[in-house]
Design a protein with these regions (language model features):
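Acidic, Ser/Thr- and proline-rich intrinsically disordered linker/docking segments
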Residues: 1-40, 70-79
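Short, mixed-charge low-complexity intrinsically disordered segments
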Residues: 39-79
Length: 79
């Protein structure tokens, strides 16, 4: 399932918060939150949107720390 995760840490461009488009094997928001709360780090696949083509491209696997997560939103993949 795809999620937009707002992290309380600087972004690549120097902003104070960092948003990540990630995919995790969870089947719901509640399941993803449960996975985050059980471990210090959760492995996700990170994606970025290509501004030219509009397609989502993988940046590979990333481990995120639940202590820096400020907000999580489900991304609707059926656009």
């Amino acid at each position: 399932m795809r999620f937009l995760v707002t992290m309380h840490m600087p972004s690549y461009s120097g902003n104070l918060v960092h948003q990540m488009n990630v995919e995790h094997k969870s089947t719901s928001l509640e399941e993803f939150v449960d996975a985050l709360s059980k471990e210090d780090f959760v492995v996700v696949e990170e994606f970025y949107r290509d501004p030219t083509t509009g397609s989502d491209n993988s940046r590979g696997m990333t481990a995120i720390n639940h202590r820096y997560v400020g907000k999580i939103k489900v991304i609707n993949q059926h656009r």
